[in-house]
């Protein structure tokens, strides 16, 4: 069953917010009226995950300019997120919120949980200001994602959201610069 055009299920989780308050709670109420990206990854202290999170950190300011809040999500605790971010040069520059899904609520609701392992699949969800999933992508364990492509998808989703009678064809972003 597709999750496209489905409203996200209410949630409340603990989180680590680097460089600010350290530990916070985040719920569905916190994202109302905002564009959000939920960026699921299997685990902290791994190999592909820090490359993706660092790439996302490089784009964080650009996403903020679009009014998009980034949430990385794994089934690790918020304490583990903090320890990893503070001990890894690769992800030291992260400033977006790292959600702890140690109770598996988000992974279950977004249908990305690998129950036998207690880990989330590598998946990305773009959620509009009404809490509706506009796009998602899931890849196998060894395939990293590209923040530049995610940025293009977010811009396309925002464009279609604001212009419901229009579409975004392939290479849409590069076409608008011609």
For every predicted segment, state its role.
Residues 1-176:
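Chalcogenol-based redox active-site neighborhoods
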């Amino acid at each position: 069953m597709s999750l496209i055009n489905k409203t996200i299920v209410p949630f409340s989780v603990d989180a680590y917010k680097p460089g600010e308050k350290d530990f916070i709670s985040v719920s569905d109420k916190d994202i109302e009226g905002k564009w959000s990206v939920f960026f699921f990854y299997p685990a902290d202290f791994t190999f592909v995950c820090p490359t993706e999170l660092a790439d996302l950190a490089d784009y964080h300011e650009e996403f903020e300019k679009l009014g998009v809040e980034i949430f990385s999500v794994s089934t690790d605790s918020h304490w583990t997120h903090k320890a990893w971010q503070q001990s890894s040069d690769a992800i030291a520059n992260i400033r977006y919120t790292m959600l702890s899904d140690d109770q598996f609520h988000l992974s279950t609701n977004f249908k990305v949980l690998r129950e036998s392992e207690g880990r989330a699949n590598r998946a990305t969800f773009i959620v509009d200001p009404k809490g509706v999933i506009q796009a998602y992508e899931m890849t196998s364990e060894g395939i990293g994602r590209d923040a530049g492509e995610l940025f293009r998808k977010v811009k396309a989703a925002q464009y279609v959201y604001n212009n419901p009678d229009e579409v975004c064809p392939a290479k849409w972003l590069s076409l608008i610069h011609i």
